[in-house]
Amino acid sequence: METKAGDPGAFAHFDLNRVDSPAFVVDAAKLRSNCQILADIRDAADIKVLAALKAFSMWATAPIIGEYLDGVCTSGLWEARLASEFYDGEIATYSAAFKPEELDEVCRLSDHVIFNSPGQMERATLILEAARASGQNFDVGLRINPMHPTGEVPRYDPSSPGSRLGFPIDQLTPEIMEGVDGIHFHNLCEQDFEPLHDTWDKVFDAIEPWFGQLKWINMGGGHHITRADYQREELVEFLKDAKEDTGAEIYLEPGEAVALDAGILVGTILDTGHNGLPVAVADISATCHMPDVIEAPYRPAMLGEAQGADTPEVRIGGPSCLAGDVIGDYRIEGGAEVGKRFAFLDQAHYSMVKTNTFNGVQLPSIYLWDSDIDQLELVKEFGYDTFRDRLS
């Protein structure tokens, strides 16, 4: 899988020695730029856009997101609580499986409660009725599986054969659709407009019988709308048509697009050596700080990586004991010397939310930088207590 990182933007001129190591640095100006693009799409197509907290939930940036977007989508109770505490606007909550004891609070916090299957929805009937009787106001949604794989990596494709995510569209019946206020589908991962259009072609016929009933249709995330080469004009016309054809409110819930190219992960070379090729150990760990590097796998782009064969490649790995804790082979400008600072691009989304303390590896600090005014703020740093208190 190839990284979708774009131009380094303002980070090309950022002094890496201004922050701790390891550290995430998020550019507020780039976030505003991304959110403005999403807001422009929203306004032009007359739809709603929610930010997906599963991808980027740095709540220090909630005021920025709230200024531009219509709310957030969450994946279960804890994200819904976070949304209620820090974010403005609507809250749409989906989970592959809700725990019954958590559902009442989910209903209280959410505007949309989206179930993964009709069975879950049916078992929750009494809870939903009690919640509404107590004055809670929410819509009930059903996630459907388009049964139309579009992804590059099967493990990231919700329509992969045997997927547990969403109810297969060929099994929908009038009985199942009773009481369903909205339909949700999420079928993309780091993709442009064409896969969305193709997915909608599959979904349209399956849900057309209920167009008069549905209040809203949520087309999920995975849309790389803020990428420079995304077909935004085509998207706007498509969304307009979808709204007119269905008579429903249309939602998008991008995650990566909110924070695309808005963050870097800064690290330091701790040691170097040679074992058939140059190797370096850094305080950045693939398994602890960037799990997608191993899961996808993919090679993250390095800020200012040297070009040309004159600079030798060095294999950079993390400080954990996992043999496979390898980030990749890179040409480091000026050489891989001990103490050298470096950074990986496009690490705001799906890295910060996945960090862990395996092997006692230190968690990266979190900084918010506004490149428009060169204002840098240490938002959060983690110590031994964080590691200790997650254990018993």
Positions of predicted regions on the chain:
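N-terminal glycine-rich, Lys/His-bearing helix-loop that initiates the first secondary-structure elements
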Residues: 1-12
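N-terminal capping/small domains of soluble enzymes
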Residues: 10-88, 97, 285, 332-345, ...
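Active-site-proximal beta-alpha core segment in soluble small-molecule metabolic enzymes
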Residues: 47-216, 230, 238
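Glycine-rich beta-alpha junction loops
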Residues: 144-148, 187-191, 221-223, 256-258, ...
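Short glycine/threonine-rich loop-to-helix capping motif typified by GTGT followed
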Residues: 192-198, 226-237, 262-271, 331-332
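Acidic, glycine-rich loop-and-beta core segments that form the ion-binding/anion-interacting portion
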Residues: 203-257
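Charged (often Lys/Glu-rich) extended helix/loop segments that serve as interaction or gating elements
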Residues: 249, 254-392
